[in-house]
């Protein structure tokens, strides 16, 4: 634990904490600030990410990851992204969700400002049903409210294993895996969203 701690950027005081502590490698789980990250982008300018890890019990935690930006034309008022990751692990299930929110963003193609956000989620569960050896349920959600969101904020969405593989196509799905003696069955639905296409043509559905 540090007393009267000051965070400086290029010798300029940015934040002051009467008391400051952070996770230690010798401690398995402990709430505290994680290592800050600096970023510089031609599109968004300079920014700093200051993550805070919070334990919520033995099987769940939350990481608050705000990103602060310098004054830039794309931001009408607020100049920060509020990003949060939640994780929960049970005996037969796991959940991880990442959400971010930004107010009054002005894109290069629209003079009006609007609130934008993202939601990435993965849920896995093992089910017990008679006559089946293994049953697994999986759900994934990839959602953004701005078509160029992933391209613009790629370098600012830190440390999320849920970041979509493509910046132009989102994949949300629900799947059920069943295993029986000498038999395997996979069923579900997948939805692909092409961010470069307008209206209903941007969605493609895949069924078993």
Where do the model's predicted regions map?
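Outer-membrane beta-barrel proteins and related beta-barrel translocases across Gram-negative bacteria
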Residues: 2-208
């Amino acid at each position: 634990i540090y007393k009267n701690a000051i965070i400086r950027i290029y010798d300029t005081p940015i934040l002051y904490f009467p008391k400051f502590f952070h996770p230690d490698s010798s401690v398995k789980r402990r709430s505290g600030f994680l290592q800050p990250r600096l970023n510089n982008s031609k599109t968004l300018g300079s920014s700093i990410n200051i993550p805070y890890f919070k334990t919520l019990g033995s099987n769940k935690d939350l990481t608050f990851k705000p990103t602060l930006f310098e004054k830039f034309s794309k931001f009408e008022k607020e100049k920060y992204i509020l990003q949060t990751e939640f994780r929960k692990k049970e005996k037969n299930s796991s959940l991880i969700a990442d959400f971010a929110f930004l107010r009054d963003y002005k894109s290069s193609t629209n003079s009006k400002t609007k609130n934008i956000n993202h939601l990435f989620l993965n849920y896995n569960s093992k089910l017990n049903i008679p006559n089946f050896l293994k049953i697994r349920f999986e759900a994934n959600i990839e959602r953004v409210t701005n078509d160029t969101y992933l391209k613009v904020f790629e370098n600012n969405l830190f440390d999320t294993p849920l970041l979509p593989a493509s910046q132009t196509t989102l994949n949300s799905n629900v799947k059920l895996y069943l295993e029986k003696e000498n038999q395997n069955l996979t069923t579900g639905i997948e939805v692909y969203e092409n961010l470069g296409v307008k209206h209903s043509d941007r969605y493609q559905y895949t069924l078993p």
